[in-house]
Amino acid sequence: MHTLKNELDKLISYVGDRKEITSYDLEQLTSSQTINQIFIMLDAIARKQRDKVLTLYYDLIELKESPFGILALLARQCNQLLQVKNLDDLGKDNGTISKEIKIPAFAVGKLKDQSKMFSIEVLLSMVEACAKTDELIKTGKINDRVGVELILIQFSQN
């Protein structure tokens, strides 16, 4: 029941002042389960919990998420963390950050908290590693599953 209430609260926050909830809104929030796993994975990366990071990754693979899709979500999340960290460092409030990077207001606080676990340099390195791996996968120079594993290991080891 608690989970359902949380999901409804997210949905209400996501649609804001609109009077109608669309199927698009529901799709966006349903895909949040995978995004939530990525969020947890980034927490584990920040804490250098390599085994947990890889377990989360393999769980996503078991759920039929593609490594390339996981990489895209990881890159997106790292980009958002970087943007939030930069705007927070400039003293912007949550509402302004929400508008500037076009994410729901409820997500800004979580991203701010998580961004504090990373330096700007580490986030930049992660974004660059994701872009490089994306290129290597697309050009056939590395297997997608291995490419993502290498990034996860690189950033979660002590």
Describe the residue ranges of each PLM region.
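Conserved beta/loop motifs at nucleotide-recognition and modification sites
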Residues: M1-N158
